[in-house]
Curated annotation (Swiss-Prot):
Region listing for Disordered, in residue ranges: 337-380
GO CC annotation: connexin complex
Chain intervals with Polar residues compositional bias: 354-369
Protein name per its UniProtKB record: Gap junction gamma-1 protein
This protein's UniProt keywords: Cell junction, Cell membrane, Gap junction, Membrane, Transmembrane, Transmembrane helix
GO biological process, one term: cell-cell signaling
Subcellular location: Cell membrane; Cell junction, Gap junction
Role played: One gap junction consists of a cluster of closely packed pairs of transmembrane channels, the connexons, through which materials of low MW diffuse from one cell to a neighboring cell. Participates in a developmental pathway for formation of the notochord and tail.
Ranges of the Cytoplasmic topological domain: 1-22, 96-171, 252-380
Species for this entry: Danio rerio (Zebrafish)
Amino acid sequence: MSWSFLTRLLDEISNHSTFVGKIWLTLFIIFRIVLTVVGGESIYYDEQSKFVCNTQQPGCENVCYDAFAPLSHVRFWVFQIILITTPTIMYLGFAMHKIARSNDVEYRPVNRKRMPMINRGRNRDYEEAEDNGEEDPMIMEEIVPEKEKAPEKSAVKHDGRRRIKRDGLMKVYILQLLSRIIFEVGFLFGQYILYGFEVAPSYVCTRSPCPHTVDCFVSRPTEKTIFLLIMYAVSCLCLSLTVLEILHLGLSGIRDAFRRRARHQSVQRPRAPICRQVPTAPPGYHTALKKDKLSLGMKPEYNLDSGRESFGDESSSRDIDRLRRHLKLAQQHLDLAYQNGESSPSRSSSPESNGTAVEQNRLNFAQEKQGSKCEKGIHA
């Protein structure tokens, strides 16, 4: 196997893992693979040849060594490395396949064309108010142009979690972390059952074909004990990093959920409604309407507050108050005229009725004059 393939494989694993995962990969390569290959070869190369028993019985040493070490330390650690890296390699293969498939045009989902947004035109109210003889549509469509996509910002450095989430690999990544934890715990328990925490300097063997109780002696027991404890520490450290990585992903996911929720609430926060000017009647509209009522013989009902809708300045309000007093007088005279109309028909041409008509004409003239002044002020 060429080293270039191994280097490319490690690069891909590093690109599709978080910051904690990269630390785990560094410790795994240095303290497990390199330490097992370099240290194990020099320490355990003569473990069976230097295993000496005080007997000359053929086959007794082999049987006693098998009882002392059912599985060699180095072979156990090599098997541990293979099984622990298996979930990571499977995850990497799945990630590369999915990314390559997403880049393929045949498997890429077809994006639907976005429907144009329809909004009520801002000039709709003015068009309805126009009397140009044209029928205005019930709904005026105003196509809102789509916002141009902003150019992507320069890639911000992050811990790799966003890239994993963007590629849709988060579930598979967490699954391989859980598998790694299970394997780590299983191998730690098996290592304790097989070897304990110390390599004994001697071993008492009573197996057949040994003729009697045989004492056997192990080469470099202290060095092997130190190396065994180092491997325990490395396994515990890798297990802690894996658990820390899962906690990191969980807390980061919760934090992103809260941020997304806060952003969603800020977007949906109700805005202050835009005030629109309520259209009002022209200044002389109510007066003309009252004149029509008088011509039809209906009893006039003057809206004493109509002046407030048309004029807003102080001078016009004083004029309106003065005219309102005249209107009250005119109303009283009109009531008397209607009450006595049947008994004396000629009463309608009396000076009182003429005075009422004069007052009404003065009111109409004042309102029209004031309305023309307001219109000139608006145009100016």
